[in-house]
Curated annotation (Swiss-Prot):
Enzyme Commission designation: 3.4.-.-
Annotated LRR repeat ranges: 634-655, 691-711, 720-743
PROSITE patterns: CARD, FIIND, LRR, NACHT
Organism: Mus musculus
GO cellular component: cytoplasm; NLRP1 inflammasome complex; nucleus
Gene of this entry: Nlrp1a
InterPro entries according to UniProt: CARD, CARD8/ASC/NALP1_CARD, DEATH-like_dom_sf, FIIND_dom, Leu-rich_rpt, LRR_dom_sf, NACHT_NTPase, NLRP_HD2
Site feature location: Cleavage: F932, S933
An individual GO BP term: pattern recognition receptor signaling pathway
Keywords: ATP-binding, Cytoplasm, Hydrolase, Immunity, Inflammasome, Inflammatory response, Innate immunity, Leucine-rich repeat, Necrosis, Nucleotide-binding, Nucleus, Protease, Repeat, Ubl conjugation
Record keyword Glycosyltransferase present: no
Trigger for autolytic processing (site feature) positions: H906
Tissue: Highly expressed in hematopoietic stem cells and progenitor cells of both myeloid and lymphoid origin. The expression is highly strain-dependent. Not expressed in Balb/cJ animals, but widely expressed in C57BL/6J. Expressed in macrophages resistant to Bacillus anthracis lethal toxin, but not in toxin-sensitive macrophages, except in CAST/EiJ strain.
Miscellaneous notes: Three tandem Nrlp1 paralogs, Nrlp1a, Nrlp1b and Nrlp1c, are present in at least 2 strains, C57BL/6J and 129S1/SvImJ. Nlrp1c is predicted to be a pseudogene. Nlrp1b is the primary mediator of macrophage susceptibility to Bacillus anthracis lethal toxin (LT). Neither Nlrp1a, nor Nrlp1c are expressed in anthrax lethal toxin susceptible strains, hence neither of them is thought to play an important role in this phenotype.
Protein name: NACHT, LRR and PYD domains-containing protein 1a
């Protein structure tokens, strides 16, 4: 018990020092080790700087360092604790300098980007399937990049990460490397190791097993150019550090080595001109769970962790700011100081700037120290301008900091001394940038020289950060925050000074004026405005946002872009909070849409903004989002469709809607995961005299109970709603009647679904006369249908609609052409094909099953897209069909496949067109007001995944009974009606009969292999099946199971090959075998009564003819011309040769096919005999 308590206290102390180095609660667990190590490091550093590094001394240093390295057992939890940083793997192209989240438009479409874990940093690149040699970790200041980099090194050392990928991992702080003028490769490697692990020659002998971690690559003022790629110096020869690093990154030295870089900026091309295409990973900070976990570690759960985190949770803005690990440390430090001073715990800060000022007020003890603080601010500003983060003792003295002041700043944690050198640095780079911004505020220039001073400050900032990235710089954001009226008062109180407020405020306008006036507004500017929070400034700047319109993500999908709508990509809760805060002051934004994916949403009727986000939104952020919106008095339309909303989030939304100041008129909540539980909240809004006039609740499972609660709100006289979009197909007749009654009593109220399937639309006959009875029109259409031979299909192929089943008729079985005559307006669904039509009037629809191979092989899309559904050629009267539901077999419930990857391919005379569906549902992609041509669903492939995606599949079992012997054919295929039909037709030719058994319940994966087994000892060939997609015109994979005499039941099973988990099983009984043979498919009238042997056994011949060339030699001159002979022989495999031969046989006469049969009997007699024996010795027209 005591030992456990001691461990907890030790962990708490470590966490409290964490922010001073790298936002890591268990960082530097062995301070004593560092002190000893530093003694050797200091001497090593002196040798490097003096350029005296004899080989014997190097060996001695290595031997001396090695025994000192011991790791605390507490570091074992580090890997577990910090894998929860949100990592977002991006796909930006090289040369694209705008970070997605920093611009009004993404540099590339982001559908392929995704969240990853730390183990996946060096995973295969999307598109190449190769592991990257260069990974760039990017992110905002204080977000945890350095923590992640150090974690990779430590986890590798402990054998938990990349141990098989890299034999040696070297960690470098670029701020420290920049202190050296010259280094050799050997010296660099010594710098990157805690202790030497092998001789330098051995290390360099396998460059592909080396990982160099360069932390803060963009911090020093250097250009890492590979100046002379052809000159390869010996590893012991020295060269300028920037040249050495440039040669490594440019692959002139150790071309097989891998690199992990951390940086704030994505515009690395100016620092590293030879940089190759990297894998870019953005760190998005802490999840909500990790924020709580951080507080528990810092204070100890029982010693204040719960109390402090509860306090922070009560301030939603502060909780959101804490997604940045550095801010978490800052908040914890402030609360700890309050505890030590015995004051009441209180933290009301809404911005990072206010939090930093609170930190200063709590940590700087007296007026003397505050005077010294001015000098520290000057040091910080000088370092920012010169891109320096390490300072010598003489640098501090030059700024007027004496030993006592230095010691005091070290004690309170503002400064820290580097363990590996004699240098000093600020506790965090963000803290240095805050002090730098403070130095500009504390400048004592006379008022008459203020404009000149402001110009000089802005020029310095522009020179340091560049115009394009000016608003991304923390120094500039802190400046905006410090120049708010409220914060200026705090500064005056803190430093007991008087600041010229109006003069200082001019600095903001100088910054805004000097930045590119025609540059599209960026997310960084909104962050600056949020830090300032001045209403006048915000109103003025946000008023100008409407001046620049730029393409949005929808434009990338070739859709029509609304020119009055702005598009902004956000990634974090903090981004969302900042944007919605600023929107309150933008009078032009009257519509707002928040999408979790880049997809087409509702079209706005007023100027608006679309926000795109790929990570989930927390309840705390929803609360801030909605509380900001209640103050946005110009906002009229809000579209949250597709965002999963918790009960807490909907409660926050409804609280906002009930406020009198909320002017929202239109609210779209389509597919938000709402249930009947939420309806009481929504009903309270309807009866609260809210301004809401239109509400869309489609694609939510509200149920009868939920809709009844909505009806209570609709009956309230205070309800202003005029349009309610509501799915009614699943509602009971009683509830639908209640809705109709409400409409009848309130003529201004319309309750409907988007498709209005129950509405009867008057139709016109050929003479333009209105036909009221749609049955009469149906009769007329039947009379006009022509003289084609038609026959009804079975009941499973019927369409089910408002009046019950509608029969589907066969127009041309050989072409797979069918016709259905829908008798009235409504919704019709065919269970067999999965097709679903919504029509406005009676209409005749023709449906032809097509093979993808006929169309897709002619396009380049087969490399980038994959088929995920059947291909139909649909013909219908224009305008009669308002929606078509095309089936797909992707298992969306697995959460792996993004619905924005779905496209509908239209094959037209002038080429192929890809259309984005209106929405993608569990089994369908929906097209609204469709135009018809051969069409089906394609899925854009993510190269790293390829075809390996979860799908709904089906098993097809067929049997053939010969005397008393039974043979089964077992197929495992995607749940595609066209494939099922093609297999049915093929098996029917061989007189096999299908047995219906349930399909696999769980999703299976395309590209995976599965093992077929039986409860009895039977012959199964092959025993392994691959789940793959093959076009209906191609032969499908199946296992043949020879049972022999079946006198008892038998169980068939399918297991995945990798884990041998059971995926499907079926029990076959003797009673399943029907004695009657299936009828032979009707052949065309002018065709022979039966198929030729060659056509009847095409599939087996393709699969089983093992020697094609002798067969071709016998056909040469008789059936095959010289050109045809060479075309077939040019194919690489026997199966491809046979397929090519069969493609040529389409034009052959019956005599030519007889020639083929004779040649086959001579070259493959045993194969022919085996086929004939299975048919009972009957040869068909041979």
């Amino acid at each position: 018990m005591e030992e456990s308590q001691s461990k907890q206290e030790s962990s708490t102390k470590v966490a409290q020092h964490e922010g001073q180095e790298d936002v890591d609660p268990t960082f530097k667990t062995k301070k004593l080790m560092e002190v000893e190590l530093m003694k050797h490091r200091v001497q090593l550093e002196r040798n490097l700087k003096l350029r005296t590094f004899p080989g014997a001394r190097t060996k001695q240093v290595k031997e001396a360092l090695y025994p000192l390295l011991t790791w605390s057992s507490k570091s074992k939890n580090l890997f577990q604790n910090f894998t929860k940083l949100l990592l977002f793997k991006k796909l930006c192209q090289r040369g694209s300098e705008n970070l997605v989240r920093e611009s009004w438009y993404p540099c590339v479409p982001e559908e392929e980007a995704h969240m990853i874990d730390i183990q996946d940093l060096f995973g295969p690149n999307l598109g190449t399937q190769k592991k990257p040699q260069l990974v760039i970790i990017e992110g905002a200041a204080g977000i945890g990049k350095s923590t992640l980099a150090r974690l990779v090194k430590r986890a590798w050392k402990e054998g938990k990460l990349y141990r098989n990928d890299f034999h040696h991992v070297f960690f470098f702080s670029c701020r420290e490397l920049a202190q050296y003028e010259q280094l050799s490769l050997a010296e660099l490697i010594v710098q990157g190791q805690e202790v030497p692990t092998a001789p330098i020659r051995q290390i360099l002998s396998h460059p592909e097993k080396l990982l160099f971690i360069l932390d803060g690559i963009d911090e020093p003022a250097w250009v890492l150019a590979d100046q002379n790629p052809e000159l390869c110096l010996h590893w012991s020869q020295t060269q300028p550090v920037h040249t050495l690093l440039g040669s490594l990154l440019g692959k002139s030295i150790l071309p097989g080595a891998s690199f992990l870089l951390t940086t704030r900026t994505t515009a690395l091309q100016k620092f590293i001109p030879s940089l190759e295409q990297p894998c870019q990973v953005e760190v998005l900070g802490f999840t909500l769970f990790e924020r709580k976990n951080y507080f528990y570690k810092y204070f100890g759960k029982k010693k204040g962790g719960v109390t402090t985190f509860t306090l922070v949770k009560s301030n939603s803005a502060l909780l959101t700011l804490c997604e940045v690990p550095w801010v978490c440390w800052l908040v914890c430090t402030c609360l700890k100081k309050q505890m030590e001073q015995g004051g009441e715990l209180s933290l009301t800060s809404q911005t990072t700037t206010a939090l930093c000022l609170k930190y200063l007020s709590l940590t700087i003890p007296g007026q003397h120290m505050r005077t010294q603080l001015r000098d520290l601010c000057s040091l910080a500003a000088e370092g920012v301008c010169q891109r320096r983060t390490l300072f010598s003792e003489s640098d501090l003295c030059k700024q007027g900091l004496d030993e006592h002041a230095i010691a005091s700043f070290l004690k309170i944690g503002v400064l820290q001394k580097q363990a590996s050198s004699l240098s000093y640095s600020f506790a965090h780079l963000c803290l240095q940038e805050f002090f730098a911004a403070m130095s500009y505020i504390l400048d004592d220039s006379e008022e008459r020289h203020a404009d000149m001073k402001n110009d000089r400050i802005v020029e310095t900032l522009v020179e340091r950060y560049g115009r394009q990235n000016l608003f991304e710089a923390p120094t500039v954001r802190f400046l905006f925050g410090l120049l708010s009226k409220e914060e200026l008062k705090k500064i005056e109180k803190l430093f007991s000074c008087s600041l010229h407020g109006k003069t200082k405020l001019k600095l903001l306008w100088h910054i805004l004026g000097k930045s590119q006036p025609h540059q599209p507004p960026c997310l960084g500017l909104l962050h600056c405005l949020y830090e300032n929070q001045d209403m006048e400034l915000l109103t003025h700047v946000m008023h100008d946002l409407q001046g620049t319109i730029v393409p949005g993500p929808d434009d990338l999908a070739h859709t029509v872009l609304q020119t009055n709508v702005k598009h902004l990509v956000i990634q974090t809760d903090m981004d969302l909070m900042v944007v919605t805060f600023c929107i309150k002051f933008c009078c032009h934004v009257r519509s707002l849409q928040l999408n979790r994916k880049v997809q087409q949403g509702h079209k706005f009727t007023a100027p608006g903004m679309v926000l795109y986000r790929w990570t989930p939104i927390t309840d705390a952020s929803w609360k801030i989002f909605f509380s900001n919106l209640k103050l946005a008095r110009n906002l009229e339309e809000l579209d949250l469709s597709g965002n999963p909303l918790s009960y807490y989030a909907v409660h926050s939304l409804c609280t906002t809607l009930r406020k009198r100041g909320c002017q929202l008129k239109t609210l779209w909540l389509v597919e938000c995961g709402l249930t009947s539980t939420y309806c009481s909240l929504l009903a309270s809004v309807l009866s609260a005299r809210s301004s809401l006039t239109e509400l869309d609740l489609q694609l939510n499972d509200l149920g009868d109970g939920g809709v009844k609660m909505l009806c209570e709100g609709l009956r309230n006289p205070a309800c202003n709603l005029s349009i309610l979009w509501l799915d009614q197909a699943s509602l009971s007749d009683q509830v639908i009647a209640e809705l109709r009654t409400l409409e009848a009593k309130n003529p201004k109220l319309l309750i409907s679904s988007t498709w209005k399937p129950h509405v009867m639309v008057p139709t016109m006959n050929m003479d333009k006369e209105e036909v009221g009875d749609s049955q009469a029109l149906l009769k007329q259409q039947r009379q006009q249908s022509g003289d084609k031979h038609m026959e009804p299909l079975g009941t499973e192929d019927e369409f089910w609609g408002p009046t019950g089943p509608v029969t589907t008729e066969v127009v041309d079985r050989e072409r797979n052409l069918y016709r259905v005559q829908l008798p009235m307006a409504g919704s019709y669904h065919c269970p067999s094909t999965g097709l679903h039509f919504v029509v406005t009037r009676a209409v005749t629809i023709e449906i032809e099953f097509c093979a993808w191979s006929q169309y897709l092989d002619k396009t380049p899309l087969q490399q980038s897209h994959m088929v995920v559904g059947p291909l139909f050629d649909i013909k219908a009267e224009q305008g009669a069909v308002t929606a078509v539901y095309l089936p797909h077999f992707v298992a969306l419930q697995e959460g792996i496949v993004d619905s924005s990857l779905f496209h509908v391919a239209h094959f037209q005379e002038h080429g192929m067109v890809l259309e984005t569906p209106a929405r993608v549902e569990q089994h369908y992609a929906v097209l609204e007001n469709p135009s018809f041509s051969p069409m089906g669903i394609l899925l854009r492939m993510i190269p790293a995944v390829g075809h390996f995606i979860p799908i709904t599949s089906t098993t097809l079992i067929y049997y053939h009974l010969y005397l008393e012997d039974v043979t089964f054919h077992l197929y495992l295929v995607p749940n595609d009606c066209s494939i099922r039909k093609a297999i049915d037709d093929e098996e029917m030719k061989f007189q096999f009969v299908r047995i219906n058994k349930p399909p696999p319940v769980d999703a299976l994966y395309l590209g995976s292999r599965y093992i077929v087994s039986s409860s009895k000892l039977v012959e199964i060939i092959p025993k392994e099946l691959e789940l793959c997609y093959r076009s209906p015109g191609e032969s499908q994979l199946f296992s043949e199971i020879d049972i022999g005499h079946m006198d008892s039941e038998i169980k068939l099973q399918i297991k995945d090959k990798r884990h041998m988990n059971l995926k499907w099983e079926a029990l076959l009984k003797p009673g399943d075998l029907r004695p009657a043979l299936p009828k032979i498919a009707t052949a065309p009238k002018d065709a022979p009564s039966l198929l030729h042997f060659m056509d009847q056994h095409r599939e087996q011949l393709v699969a089983r003819v093992t020697s094609v060339d002798p067969l071709l030699d016998k056909l040469h001159g008789l059936v095959l011309s010289e050109d045809s002979y060479e075309v077939v022989r040019s194919e690489t495999t026997n199966q491809d040769k046979m397929r090519k031969l069969f493609s040529l046989s389409r034009s052959w006469s019956w005599d030519c096919k007889d020639q083929f049969y004779q040649a086959l009997k001579e070259t493959h007699p045993h194969l022919v005999m085996d086929i004939l024996e299975k048919l009972g010795g009957v040869s068909v027209k041979s």
